Amino acid sequence: MANTREHRYTVSLTWNGNLGTGTSGYRDYSRNYEIVSNGKPAIQGSADPACRGDRSRWNPEELLVASLSACHKLWYLHLAAEAGIIVTAYTDRAEGARDCPGLY
């Protein structure tokens, strides 16, 4: 793969969960954050609700599963095009799981 070029991806994540006392205690701060990159719409994030996060925001686990799903879809479409297979629609329902021993 001598013709491979390195691609770099940069995002900025800002924690905006200081409720006035910073991280003075486990229950004293919000897990909310914002992700931005190159003028794209911001992603409002938080922790998983089980970890005191805001369920209306994307959590890192959901973003990881979405990222893997998107990569799989893009590769699938590439392989289909290369093989002369015409794809006219695509839907994926990806799922992830994790164990959280001792987190609470």
Which residues are covered by each model-predicted region?
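Extended beta-strand/beta-hairpin segments
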Residues: M1-A66, L74-Y104
